[in-house]
């Protein structure tokens, strides 16, 4: 059986679609699955089972990238096509059965997938390999708490100020020096955030894995105690690794994109989403200031204890 799954360009949406992939892997364990996803998200499938091919969609002008994918997939008669992008591509490919995701509003993205496709899409899953887990375990010490911290994001208005992250981590360290902060994000985010977030914190309490692959980051998440970060793909990755997750929200919709899972928590700005929707947001400015250091600290202490 040959299955084609057309995923999102975005890391977060692709992580949220891993429940779809899990469903087909479980239902058809002998199937050969081809993935189409964006270049940043494609590495999420590095360790997935049932893989036949992985195609990276690198955007081109006038949507010409779809022609590249078309010519790579047109000669195959697919048993199942799952189109999570509602693209035209799936209408031009031979198939026996087709699932096309149709977005809804006001419910979580996972529930949208489940309702639209007609099966349970909630079993988020990221596969890590033995080497990745060995590397993570080597730095995870049993006598310490380990907090994954993601201070970045792809949109400045939803990023909590780095100075507040630093103050919050200092406060945590002062209350319990048996804690290690695992800093995650891209190599570019390392340049932007590493110095300021780690100021006045002993280097032995910092584990810097900025720039590591998504699956290596996931391996660290699987052996850690808690995640704190902005609304982001790495926040969804944390949920997929079954790590307790606290996420900070302001001008984005936590009802749709909040951390999936019963034990996970959203800390919102004092302003609600309607407030932000009425504003002409400055793309170079954070709108997360009304979330206080103490507010985040108290929630972290509650979860870590």
Task: Show where each model-derived region lies.
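Catalytic machinery of carbohydrate-active enzymes
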Residues: 1-305
């Amino acid at each position: 059986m040959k299955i084609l799954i057309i995923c999102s360009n975005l890391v977060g949406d692709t992580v949220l679609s891993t429940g779809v992939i899990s469903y087909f892997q479980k239902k058809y364990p002998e199937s050969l699955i081809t993935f189409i996803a964006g270049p940043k998200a494609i590495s999420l499938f590095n360790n997935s089972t049932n893989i036949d091919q992985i195609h990276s969609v690198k955007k081109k002008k006038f949507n010409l990238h779809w022609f590249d994918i078309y010519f790579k997939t047109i000669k195959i008669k697919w048993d199942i096509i799952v189109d999570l992008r509602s693209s035209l591509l799936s209408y031009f490919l031979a198939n026996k059965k087709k699932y096309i995701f149709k977005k809804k509003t006001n419910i979580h993205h996972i529930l949208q997938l489940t309702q639209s496709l007609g099966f349970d899409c909630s079993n988020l899953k990221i596969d890590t390999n033995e080497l990745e887990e060995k590397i993570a375990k080597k730095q995870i010490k049993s006598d310490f708490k380990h907090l994954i911290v993601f201070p970045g994001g792809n949109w400045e208005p939803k990023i909590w100020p780095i100075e507040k992250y630093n103050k919050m981590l200092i406060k945590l360290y002062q209350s319990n020096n048996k804690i290690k902060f695992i800093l995650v994000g891209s190599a570019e985010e390392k340049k932007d955030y590493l110095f300021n977030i780690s100021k006045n914190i002993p280097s032995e309490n910092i584990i810097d894995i900025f720039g590591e692959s998504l699956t290596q980051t996931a391996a660290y998440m699987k052996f850690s105690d808690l995640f704190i970060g902005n609304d982001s793909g790495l926040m969804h990755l944390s949920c997929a690794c079954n790590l307790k997750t606290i996420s900070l929200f302001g001008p984005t919709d936590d009802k749709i994109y909040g951390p999936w899972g019963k034990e996970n928590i959203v800390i919102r700005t004092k302003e609600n989403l309607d407030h932000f929707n009425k504003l002409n947001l400055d793309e170079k400015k954070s709108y997360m200031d009304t979330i206080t250091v103490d507010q985040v600290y108290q929630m972290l202490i509650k979860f870590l204890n």
